[in-house]
Amino acid sequence: MKSKVQKKFFKTTPIALALIVSGYTAAPHAIEFNWGDVEGSFNSQITAGSSWRVEDSDAKNAGVGNGGLPGNTPTGDDGNLNYAKGDAFTQTIKGLHDLGLTYETEEGITFGAFVRGKYWYDYALDKNDVIHGSGTNNYVANQPINNDDFNNLTKSKGVALLDAYIFTGFYLGETAVDLRIGKQVVNWGESSFIQGGINAVNPVDAAAFRRPGAEVKEGLLPVNMIFANVGLTDNLSIEAFYQLEFEPTVIDSCGTYFSTADYLAEGCNTLVVDPNTGLTDKGLYDAGIYATRGTDEMASNDGQFGVAFKYYAESLNATEFGLYYMNYHSRLPYASAEAGLANTLVPGQGYTYGQAISSPFVPVGTDLSGLGTTAEQYNSNYHTVYPEDIQLFGLSFNTTVSEWAVSGEVSHRLDLPLQINGADLLASALTGDPDSPLTPQYKEAAAGSTVDGFDRFDYTQSQLTFIKFFDKALGTDRITAVAELGYGHVWDLPEGDDDIKYGRATVYGKSFDGIGDDDDGFTTSDSAGYRLAVKADYRNVFAGVDLAPSVAWSHDVYGYSPEPQGTFQEGRTGVNLALKANYLNMYSMSVSYTQFGGDFNPLSDRDYVSVAVGISF
């Protein structure tokens, strides 16, 4: 028989909670079939939807040459400037299909396979003109974004295989064993909303989550791995995985609505550099004041593995405890630079870009004098790095207290990379700003060598989650309430005025130029925030129609977490108001409004509304 851990009484995984909050209902009209002794099911979801911007852009979120505030840089504002209030930034039709097959022998051994795939087409991304342009089309305005070189999952149209694995379940004596091999998702830990905890096995597809009517299963990227779950005793089980490949998180592509970096995503190979010229992105590009992307440093396919022990303590209020260890490579990219090649120029003499003959981005005839730059800087380029071998240790629990489901976790990472402030990094590597604390290490680096744009620190994060169901309350069939609190701490982080600064979106400028805000928004030792969500279910309101209004609220109260994850950013807020209608558990329609806030949140002026309709069968 299955161990108590494997058939546990209550378990709210991140996916399960997301389904609760979103109002998702598994398709009851799935096609079920038998092929001899093989049982199968085929599920389909077709969705069409659109999203529109409902707020004007704010000058605080744009580079100074693009109409932004003094001190702001032009390296993270393309997505903001491309869409005016009222513009549709996505108009998508998509399909999601999965096939499951199961076969059980007379001895009770189970074999099976599961495959899931999706396809999509986004008319707005493919055909709609944008106002500002991006580096992918040389900042030519009033034409569609060129997404030809984007990651396949962020393009305007595509087909993708998600899950694809085989599995088996059997007994070794009294020991239950489950094995899965192939592209799959593994969920660990107890976090429901707050990122940066134990649940770090799989990367995320940000573009999928941006599309109207998104499901959690569309946005978690399966990875080829071997996974095993073994019931060691009636109360103790062990889980383990070994990944067979490295897959990065898919971030928002440059120029698209939610992008906050114009140069990091795949296919975004141009970085305009503004050495205090005040030019627009188009002006900088036409003047040749831009850097090109070098060769990205992808992580190895080897060395990612983890093990978890789950113990079910029935005598301790039926509590499950978890103990975790994982070694993984960063799913998120870190900006770094390559030290330039020296030219034989006389110090202190004015030069034109044309004299820096090996520069990849300088036009002939532009005077370099007074910019405080050297030939070495103008031979630099930038690229992204995926740092390897981050070790994670974790503890978790979940139980019930009165009628509340209560869970929590603590995770500790050894050698977590912290992104150096991007504006400081780029100013040092590409313009040689003499005031930057980073410039000396670029000047001292060997020509052609990589100077990492990150330093490593240990990081601890803890979270508590509370879930409560209120049945037949306030005229509803059920109200679901969720609250989650989180706190993070970076160990031994230097925070002096002259120390290197970490984090903060590049659009908000450098930490040392005395223009704009030099002091706030950078990574701090401590940070905290909370998330709240409430959903009401009204069943069969009329003629088989179910209604599910919901509200979700997020608030980062204190401090700034390590970037690029950026779990907590002081003052950052978000609210989502939604109403979903479901007819006969087959047809659905949803309407939502999302609002952002925060002083150092580049999305703070990108409120939007979404509408989606779908069919499940």
Residue ranges and their predicted role:
Residues 90-92, 326-328, 333, 407, ...:
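Detector for outer-membrane/organellar transmembrane beta-barrel domains
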Residues 42-44, 113-115, 179-181, 228, ...:
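Membrane-embedded beta-strand positions of outer-membrane beta-barrel proteins
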Residues 48-54, 119-123, 127, 183-187, ...:
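Transmembrane beta-strands of outer-membrane beta-barrel pores
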Residues 33-75, 113-117:
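Transmembrane beta-strand segments of Gram-negative outer membrane beta-barrel proteins
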Residues 605-617:
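Outer-membrane beta-barrel "beta-signal"
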Residues 29-42, 55-57, 99-113, 167-179, ...:
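Short loop/turn motifs that connect adjacent beta-strands in outer-membrane beta-barrel proteins
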Residues 58-80, 126-150, 202-211, 252-293, ...:
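Solvent-exposed loop segments that connect transmembrane elements
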Residues 107-262, 529, 558-559, 568-573, ...:
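Outer membrane beta-barrel
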